[in-house]
Amino acid sequence: MYIYTVKPGDTLFDIAQKNGVTISALVAANQLSDPYKLPVGLALVIPGQSIRERSIVVNGYAFPGISDIALLGALQYLTYLSVFSAKTRIDGTITELNDTALIRKCYVNGVAPVLTLTNQRESGGFSGDIAHAVIADEEVKTKLIQNVMEYLDRRNYFGLNIDFEYVREEDRTLYTQFLLDFAAALRRVGYSFSVALAPKISQEQSGLLYTAHDYGAVGSIADKVIIMTYEWGYTYGEPMAVAPIDKVRQVLDYAVMEMPPEKILMGMANYGYSWTLPYKKGTAARPLSLSEIPQTAYSQYADIRFDLSLIHISEPTRP
């Protein structure tokens, strides 16, 4: 906690953004009867610790049950921690999380806690049917936005991340409007807003994972865009890297043509796979954690081929 003195031209929105807290937290901490009237010189209590400024912006995802050892080891490197996830129901309600302690630890360590909203079933797996139910019905959509806004305020989140996957191609325009409506509601009270997108290399790219994700539109709507640049190598696929550098580069080269580069957060896989060779089509690869990957290489006396000189992303000129 510390004190901020109101300066000429300050608004509550500006002060909240500048100090990494929500407007509701400022109002509650200072018992403001009229948040829209801030006299110059007023001393405002800024609750908690401000969000650290970094030379790069880093977002991490975590389940509420993450261990303290893993959490505290990661928080020192993060700008945002996206808590995964509140699941959307077809009636516009959401599942709630055991997230109170996690949010508090984020603020104590100068990290912004962000709620991730998904179209996952409660039994698991992303559902295009759930997405359609809440974006195609205005009444349900309004109810969902209201429920999310109330939850963000009640739990003192810093912002919202939307991760809707496998949205139907015919719902592309509806999904974009859904994001616009959420953005308007969030910005009225000063929340940050990010959207997760599938890794596209062109506007025309086909496939259920890609078609409803409009890079240009989302880039103009969201504060940050998290691009899922991974999963080329997958459980039942042929042996290959999870995130091949040439594939990642193709996605980012396209992305910076469609949206401001400073909005883009490149996704990084925190897992790998081990295939049994010779590979037989239809067989499953064994998933590996980041700590298991080098251990597996060492146990097989395999070389780890890591070349930093290959990791360079050019920035094409936007039209």
Model-predicted regions and their roles:
Residues 90-97, 173-177, 181-300:
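Substrate-binding surface in catalytic domains of secreted glycosidases
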Residues 49-147:
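Glycan-recognition patch characteristic of GH18 chitinases/ENGases
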Residues 12, 88-94, 131-138, 164-172, ...:
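Second-shell loop/turn segments in exported
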